[in-house]
């Protein structure tokens, strides 16, 4: 039995100015004023009542927000201490949309959505947009360039021109486009046709006789290393987990794993790019939150920050809405526009289709921004229509810092490009540039090199350049005054590229596989370059003034170098850099005491270092469990042991025990802030023994604010049993009192 009692306290409660605004999705109401005892139910409701410098404290739960923060300086939004708060950008197709899936004749299931969606999740794992050649997220094959089809153009054959691409008939893991039988017209081609740049274009024509597709010309075009894949057409659905959304009819098509009924699955669709848009507000902070399939954008802010936050699937392209050739200024990514002194710290960004973070604006509009002690993984599996040189972390401004971070598994050709005079220190980066040709891990164009400081990084296991001072060849290169020191690079294709002049590269260690390029490339081309640079105290197996030729043919300029250990000059069949380090296989890169490296003072570490520096994040990243919503009560019929947030929809089986009756009386004591409960059980006999529970709920019927348990043991000859309890609530009501009774399982 249940009975409610009400209180008007929360409707009339006032929040003193300067105190936090509390939010509780389970027990709050946006009709209340946001005190600790009378919280709001949404963050948006709290923001509507907020003033500058307010703090919004959010209790555990799942929140679907779409809010603009305008002219609220100093606002902080954070999770309550110890609570898990997830900002969710998806809607459940079954629960939120109440939509029903149907089966098409070819076995593909479909559902009509009430609003647009462009990213599909099964059990909170992203499903693959239908594509050819096939690839998947589960095995990371989306980051394998062999899962792209190839074009036939080379520097010498002039096979086709911009706006056309001839398929090579099949290579790698798949056959050719003609063999597939697919009609590509109307699909979207993701085209890597400009080395470090890729574009999405609608396929407008298909000539099967010469296996050539046509599309609108791309902005940049190179005559080598062409690769592509197709998306955006129902015909491409051929493996389990693939989907396509028809934006004209709002119909979603999906090939369900193992021929299951999609109506029985936890399927969610992304419906918003941003949960929070911050405009005209300085010092806005988001702290200790999780974002799932949504993110944040800032415009015109100073001192805004994201701290102690995990973002999963924050960035997406618009191709899921069948939009190709996206404007790079309007990509749906975590972005700061015209912002300075911003901070991202102790945060994680995972699984994006697009860049991880973008800062837009020139030197006067975007400067002194910092990304520190943060983790980036599985960033950008399509690498199309992104800004700059198409990078993982982008900033177009000046004096920005990227420090103590960890990055691995990225698609874009360049990883870090953060504007003029960058500081890139204490990072560990590997497995980068997987889906484009050319590129570098730390990329500095000619005008960005002045006062750059690149130091104390580990960069390894990549086919891209490690640290590159880029620009035109020869005397036209005016890149100047970058400093690169105390870095360790291994298994890198051209670890350090020094191009320009007046640069300083010292105390770097480079070892192992050079992947066809010199470890340190100090370019002198067309009679110009690096006449005044200083290259000192480095340890590398190959240092020369050419990308791949040796020291004898391309020595460094006289007077620019000294105290280096250069394998071209000093090495032998038995001696290389790694042979003189303490334990490089276990990442101890200190030189062995009394080794030649030690005597020269060459390399990134000193032999006497007792606490050698280690780059990367200072904490251990553990991916959160999926933010599953369900019944949390283990006594309920629909208890979900995997759920972490309450759905408020537990189901209980009603058991009638003969002529058993009960009466519940719950009254507010007029002279005190407590409630008295009297429960009478009638027709109880001594032949049966029962257990009971009395509990109170406020908003969420699954959340027990207080409970009592006991046994009913009537005396022989009696058939009534009475329970009296008293409780003082910690929060104002209204409350509902519940009583459950069941047979003693031990009897």
Per-segment meaning from a language model:
Residues 653-677:
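Short, compositionally biased P/S/T/A/G/V-rich stretches that sit at domain boundaries
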Residues 64-76, 475-588:
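Predominantly extracellular beta-rich ligand-binding scaffolds that present long acidic/polar faces
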Residues 723-731:
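Short, hydrophobic beta-strand segments
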Residues 1-9, 623-655:
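Primarily marks secretory-pathway-exposed extracellular/lumenal segments that are disulfide-
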Residues 66-67, 293-298, 315-324, 330-332, ...:
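Short glycine/acidic-rich loop motifs that flank beta-strands on beta-rich extracellular proteins
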Residues 52, 277-285, 302-305, 330-345, ...:
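Surface-exposed loop/turn motifs in large extracellular/passenger domains
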